[in-house]
């Protein structure tokens, strides 16, 4: 790669070459113009790790804690380090652009991708995202803020019209993007799938050009979300530089014709191409060649950072009687469906093949010096557990053979064209390629051998984007090839799981074969659903057992145990891109299991893994409760570090946890109805709503305990004289002394809130405006400083003036942290002023 003379290159490009540059060539790569030294660039998903170019059978990668977990750290320095490692992982995968971070706003607990965004509050989300992007882009890799804007649900996400006031748009949904840009102007922004107030964002000139480019002064590249381009002229004229993925649906000859007929002017094309060429120059110093090989890092220092991030994200919600930390020398009973499952990431674009994973059970067992026993407690799978890791190949390897043919199984003498060895029995083939496969229609036989450990009836399940028949010892057990029903897996492309059963004997080996046909072999009506390539498959199995049997056994064991910890929650099956949750509840049986174990042993520690809030009807019984999110590669070790006191928890909730779904402010206005969703809660998202209506959530935004105690004192506040025009340069500086009054070293998160004066405008009771994190030894005191610009601390969006308004009056400053202590001060705004810009 070489630095391009952008203006000279634009002059030398033909119209056809310009058109080609504005669309991808495949799922992950941009177009090249070799004669002008313009190379193809590679992009890769990056919500919580850099997957590389393959969903299917890809090169393993580091998996970071999910964004809500990172949001819970409230730690800008950690987010910077995470960003740097993300950049280094991207370089290892030969990718110039990371498609992240996501900074949408969780207006509902049910959003399928809620775990991908940092927080319900724009200040917390935007500041963390800015430091993350700063770390990432300092490696030379381009970051992509997404999804711009109001992509806050999965239901009908390609078509839904988000009806939102401009005030809510500015104060809630655009704010994290605005604040992130103040810290780091990212090289790229990705548009949202949805419409906003009647127009798809990818062709919304007000959002892309007027706000992002003109008002904020941003000059990077705007790309579509994958298949999120819906027009030729409208999108190119609105400011959408790049349609992804390729091959193009809307550009190509259609765009060339539009330019020749003056429906899109060539000077507009030049602007689109200019932004694309500027991106080339941004990433050129990386020296990553076209189609670079994908490598793994997995360095010890990276593992240490991932473990620290996992541990520092764990929120201590309750700790009555100082049950935690646990005693390493005492025996421990581990219970629950998440104990031996590594719930390390959510589903969809966030999913990847991690270098390794550590389950909570493994994390506890590695640190306990006493006996560690296990009880399942309940099964919480949405679909039957993957069978692949329990299979063996005919030559004794873990997993199964994946044999590819162009002809169906009914064809005699068909030719084997590819054979792979796989362990995971879940595969999305969107990026599978082979030179002998010319179309999306082909067939795969997956064959392995299963030896059950227990007698019993075993249930088998098959989910496909395509068709599938599962045989056990040549007996058809599951037929998912006819009368198929659409489900939610694989971005909403897959069928529901079809099941069958067979009685098996312990110790006997059975041959298991899945005959799979790709997506075109299915008779499922897929109108309105984007088909990603040739389809996908998933097959699982489990011994049939009653939940009552499992719960009773767990409760009995708990009644006799000296230390008990439950690991329950959700997984990537329940929280994933492609669909929203129907409710906030844990999977069936989990609440009853937790409640009965707590009755049997009230000192049981409960650990919940989820990316977003869940209901906890047993919370009043639990003395010790942790929220542990999806913790990445090191989730099990990170949780165990907190349980045993190696790490003193300091995390605070980045989301409000309502008592029940009906309490959340978007309850009446979530999901698409007749093609639209009304953002009826307006600016009252999350804590802004609960505080305004004086409705206590189960656990509030910003909540989190510690193994030590802190005090805050000596609050001082300094302002600067007001200028005629309100702009940057009028900082409010808040200084406070923080003391560790306990006996354990630990970190405190100091939160700065501002409460507005009473005016004629309805405003939140208070809003977060700044925060900092400080580590203190027992008895140590440190002064900390939080600085926030007056315009950001005081303003609301005036829809009549179409400007931010900082109104005259007395503003109260509140400083909070761990515990109930609140320090207060105030400052004056002497006259009302208005402003625009970043």
Swiss-Prot record:
One cellular-component annotation, GO: extracellular region
Subcellular localization(s) per the UniProt record: Secreted
Domain PA14: 395-555
Spans traversing the lipid bilayer: none
Domain of life: Eukaryota
This protein's UniProt keywords: Carbohydrate metabolism, Cellulose degradation, Glycoprotein, Glycosidase, Hydrolase, Polysaccharide degradation, Secreted
Cleaved signal peptide residues: none
Keyword Glycoprotein in record: yes
EC id: 3.2.1.21
UniProt enzyme class: hydrolase
Pfam families for the chain: Fn3-like (PF14310), Glyco_hydro_3 (PF00933), Glyco_hydro_3_C (PF01915), PA14 (PF07691)
Function, as annotated: Beta-glucosidases are one of a number of cellulolytic enzymes involved in the degradation of cellulosic biomass. Catalyzes the last step releasing glucose from the inhibitory cellobiose.
Record family assignment: Belongs to the glycosyl hydrolase 3 family.
Protein name, as recorded: Probable beta-glucosidase I
Organism: Aspergillus fumigatus (strain CBS 144.89 / FGSC A1163 / CEA10)
Gene: bglI
């Amino acid at each position: 790669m070489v630095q391009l003379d952008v203006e000279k290159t634009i002059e030398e490009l033909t119209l056809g070459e310009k058109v080609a540059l504005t669309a991808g060539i495949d799922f992950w790569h941009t177009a090249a113009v070799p004669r002008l030294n313009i190379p193809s660039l590679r992009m890769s998903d990056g919500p919580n790790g850099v997957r590389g170019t393959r969903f299917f059978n890809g090169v393993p990668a580091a998996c970071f804690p999910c964004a809500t977990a990172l949001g819970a750290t409230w730690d800008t320095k950690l987010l910077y380090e995470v960003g740097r490692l993300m950049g280094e992982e991207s370089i290892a995968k030969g990718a110039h652009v990371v498609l992240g971070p996501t900074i949408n706003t969780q207006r509902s607990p049910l959003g399928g991708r809620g775990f991908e965004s940092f927080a319900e509050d724009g200040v917390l989300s935007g500041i963390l995202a800015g430091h993350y992007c700063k770390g990432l882009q300092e490696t030379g890799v381009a970051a992509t803020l997404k999804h711009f804007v109001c992509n806050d649900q999965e239901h009908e996400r390609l078509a839904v019209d988000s009806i939102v006031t401009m005030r809510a748009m500015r104060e809630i949904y655009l704010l994290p993007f605005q604040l992130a840009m103040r810290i780091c102007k990212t090289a790229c922004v990705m548009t949202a799938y949805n419409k906003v107030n009647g127009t798809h964002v990818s062709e919304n000139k007000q959002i892309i050009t007027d706000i992002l480019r003109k008002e904020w002064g941003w000059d990077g590249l705007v790309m579509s979300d994958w298949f999120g381009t819906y027009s030729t002229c409208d999108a190119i004229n609105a400011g959408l530089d790049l349609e992804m993925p390729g091959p193009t649906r809307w550009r190509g000859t259609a765009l060339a014709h539009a330019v020749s007929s003056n429906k899109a002017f060539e000077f507009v094309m030049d602007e689109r191409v200019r932004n694309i060429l500027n991106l080339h120059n941004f990433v050129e110093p990386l020296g990553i060649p076209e189609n670079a090989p994908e490598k793994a890092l997995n360095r010890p220092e990276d593992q240490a950072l991932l473990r620290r991030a996992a541990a520092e994200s764990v929120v201590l919600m309750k700790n009555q009687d100082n049950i935690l930390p646990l005693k390493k020398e005492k025996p421990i009973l581990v219970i629950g469906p998440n104990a031996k499952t590594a719930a390390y990431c959510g589903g969809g674009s966030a999913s990847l093949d991690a270098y390794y994973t550590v389950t909570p059970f493994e994390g506890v067992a590695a640190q306990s010096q006493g006996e560690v026993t296990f009880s399942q407690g309940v099964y919480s799978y949405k679909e039957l557990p993957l069978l692949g890791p329990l299979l063996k190949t005919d030559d004794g390897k873990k997993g199964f053979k994946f044999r590819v043919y162009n002809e169906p199984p009914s064809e005699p003498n068909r030719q084997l064209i590819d054979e792979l060895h796989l362990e995971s029995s879940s595969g999305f083939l969107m990026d599978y390629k082979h030179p002998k496969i010319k179309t999306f229609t082909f067939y795969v036989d997956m064959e392995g051998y299963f030896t059950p450990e227990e007698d019993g009836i075993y249930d088998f399940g098959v989910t496909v984007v395509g068709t599938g028949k599962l045989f056990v010892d040549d007996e058809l057990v599951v037929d998912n090839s006819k009368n198929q029903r659409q489900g939610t897996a694989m971005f909403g492309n897959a069928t529901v799981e079809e099941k069958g059963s067979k009685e098996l004997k312990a110790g006997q080996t059975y041959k298991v074969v899945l005959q799979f046909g790709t997506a075109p072999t299915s008779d499922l009506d897929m109108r309105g659903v984007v088909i990603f390539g040739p389809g996908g498959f998933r097959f699982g199995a489990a011994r049939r057992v009653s939940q009552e049997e499992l719960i009773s056994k767990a409760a009995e064991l708990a009644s006799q145990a000296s230390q008990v910890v439950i690991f329950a929650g959700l997984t990537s099956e329940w929280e994933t891109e492609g669909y929203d949750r129907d409710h906030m509840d844990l999977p069936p049986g989990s609440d009853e299991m937790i409640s009965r174990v707590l009755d049997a042993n009230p000192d049981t520690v409960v650990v919940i893994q989820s990316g977003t809030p869940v209901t906890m009807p047993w919370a009043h019984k639990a003395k010790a409760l942790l929220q542990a999110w999806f913790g990445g590669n090191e989730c099990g070790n990170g949780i165990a570090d907190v349980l045993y006191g190696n790490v003193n928890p300091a995390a605070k909730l980045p989301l409000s946890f309502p008592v029940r779904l009906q309490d959340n402010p978007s309850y009446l206005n979530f999901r698409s109805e007749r093609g639209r969703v009304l953002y009826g809660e307006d600016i009252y998202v999350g804590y802004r709503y609960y505080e305004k209506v004086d409705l206590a959530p189960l656990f509030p935004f910003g909540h989190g305990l510690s193994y030590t105690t802190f005090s805050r004192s000596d609050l001082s506040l300094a302002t600067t004289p007001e200028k005629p025009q309100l702009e940057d340069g009028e900082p409010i500086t808040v200084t406070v002394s923080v003391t560790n009054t306990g006996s354990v070293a630990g970190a405190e998160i100091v939160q700065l809130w501002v409460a507005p004066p009473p005016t004629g405008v309805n405003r939140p009771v208070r809003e977060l405006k700044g925060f900092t994190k400080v580590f203190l030894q027992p008895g140590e005191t440190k002064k900390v400083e939080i600085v926030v610009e007056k315009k950001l601390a005081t303003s609301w969006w005036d829809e009549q003036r179409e400007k931010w308004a900082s109104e005259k009056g007395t503003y109260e400053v509140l400083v909070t942290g761990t515990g109930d202590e609140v320090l207060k001060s105030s400052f004056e705004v002497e006259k009302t002023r208005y402003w625009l810009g970043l």
